[in-house]
């Protein structure tokens, strides 16, 4: 049983007499009343055991739409294969949004299967895949879950590309206009290095440790495409499904406006002092989850997002031309560019600053009114790009000839694969090949790990 606080206890006294003894008397205020009067939301301690997962609904929604665009998934065998394994790719978000994607819980530490679309978050990330246990001294500490990859996969989920580089154009624009020159690890490392002083200043202002801020989202997609192709050529439906299922997550990140922007958590040049503290916060603090989680959840509950998304996928006209893994990475750059054009990150941040102080019951509708329809559009485009990448990898690996379309891959087989850090290994930006025409399915881990023994 999971207990939640329901009141604020202000104090307790005991009244006593010689006949009936002492009787406790406490003064408490119902949390719902207090929060309503103070116009506040209940937020759990960020250091508490994480018993829920943010941000999975959108990824699963895009994954469920994978076989929908039949103008892109032209192979009947591929459509059959996808439909037969769809529940392993992505669960169906219900109206209550009560699907539970956690690997383990304190109540039941037995590892559970996680649908592939959110394995990159819910299994591989160290800040998600853990439970809190007590040590011999009774102190809480994190116990990592099976399959966790520390922070090695985190940079594959984002890429802050919308800052100027070598002139007035953003690095994203340069990648769109001349991918042969800029869409490679060396060029990206040079771009991030040029921003070191700026990144360091922002980190110092917010009291964070310095980091390289390396993002590698399109390169991860390139790698997964090549793994899918190799798996199809080898007649390996398990690896094909594992790689292609986790691919859903990264394509989903690419069509979320804030995942490829330096404004992902707010404008780092616009900060405030946290009330009652010396800590500095972004003025738009909370915008990422406010947009990607709360607004999307509101759309599902109140605006029939699932139905509208399915309709938009079918009616979409985006048809990226993809033959190789390099083409897939270029498609991701194009997807990011179109997404930010339709839903500019700056607009999201500005709107959030405008409405963040109002009640959640008013804030979510305000965000939806501002961005709901456009968000359905970019999610639908993401689903169509995902379908095009799947079809291209299937064709490149002769899936029609090599993969049994009727095979149903078991959850146990998929868990064995995604819990193995050597399968679709998560590597850093400087570990991706310089040659876009190389076989990126051959990427190996360079560092040893106890689990490799």
Cite the ranges covered by each PLM segment.
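Divalent metal-coordination and catalytic microenvironments
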Residues: 59, 249, 386
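Internal, helix-rich recognition cores of eukaryotic regulatory domains
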Residues: 59, 254-255
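N-terminal, motif-rich segments that launch catalysis or mediate targeting to/interaction with membranes
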Residues: 6, 10-242, 260-380, 391-453
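Short alpha-helix carrying the canonical HExxH Zn2+-binding catalytic motif
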Residues: 240-248, 252-254
């Amino acid at each position: 049983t999971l207990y939640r606080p329901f009141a604020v206890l202000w104090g307790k006294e005991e009244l006593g007499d010689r006949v009936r003894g002492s009787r406790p008397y406490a003064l408490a205020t119902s949390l719902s009343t207090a929060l309503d009067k103070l116009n506040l939301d209940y937020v759990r301690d960020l250091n508490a055991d994480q018993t829920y997962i943010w941000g999975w609904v959108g990824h699963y929604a895009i994954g469920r739409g994978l076989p929908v665009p039949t103008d892109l998934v032209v192979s009947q065998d591929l459509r059959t294969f996808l439909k037969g394994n769809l529940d392993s790719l992505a669960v169906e978000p219900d109206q209550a949004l009560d699907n539970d994607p956690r690997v383990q819980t304190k109540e039941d530490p037995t590892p559970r299967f996680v649908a592939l679309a959110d394995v990159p978050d819910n299994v591989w990330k160290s800040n998600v895949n853990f439970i809190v246990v007590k040590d011999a001294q009774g102190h809480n500490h994190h116990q990592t879950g099976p399959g966790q990859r520390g922070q090695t996969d985190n940079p594959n989920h984002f890429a802050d590309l919308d800052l100027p580089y070598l002139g007035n154009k953003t690095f994203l624009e340069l990648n769109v206009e001349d991918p042969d020159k800029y869409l490679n690890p060396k060029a990206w490392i040079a771009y991030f290095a040029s921003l070191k002083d700026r990144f360091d200043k922002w980190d110092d202002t917010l009291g964070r440790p310095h980091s390289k801020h390396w993002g590698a989202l399109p390169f991860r997609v390139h790698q997964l495409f090549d793994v899918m192709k190799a798996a199809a050529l080898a007649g390996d439906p398990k690896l094909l499904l594992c790689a292609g299922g986790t691919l859903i997550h990264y394509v989903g990140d690419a069509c979320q406006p804030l995942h490829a922007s330096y404004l992902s958590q707010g404008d780092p040049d616009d900060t405030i002092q946290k009330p009652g503290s010396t800590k500095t916060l972004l003025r738009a603090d909370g915008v990422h989850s406010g947009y990607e989680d709360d607004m999307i959840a509101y759309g599902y509950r109140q605006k029939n997002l699932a139905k509208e998304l399915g309709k938009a996928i079918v009616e979409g006209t985006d048809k990226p031309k993809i033959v190789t893994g390099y083409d897939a990475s270029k498609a991701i750059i194009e997807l990011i560019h179109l997404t930010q054009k339709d839903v500019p990150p700056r607009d999201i941040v500005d709107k959030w600053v405008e409405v963040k102080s109002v009640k959640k019951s008013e804030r979510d509708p305000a965000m939806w009114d501002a961005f709901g329809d456009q968000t359905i559009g970019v999610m639908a485009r993401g689903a169509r790009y995902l379908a095009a990448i799947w079809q291209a990898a299937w064709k490149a690996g002769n899936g029609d000839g090599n993969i049994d379309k009727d095979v149903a891959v078991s959850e146990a087989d998929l868990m064995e694969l995604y819990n193995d850090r050597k399968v679709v290994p998560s590597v850093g930006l400087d570990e991706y090949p310089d040659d876009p025409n190389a076989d990126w399915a051959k990427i190996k881990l360079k560092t040893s790990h106890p689990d490799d023994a």
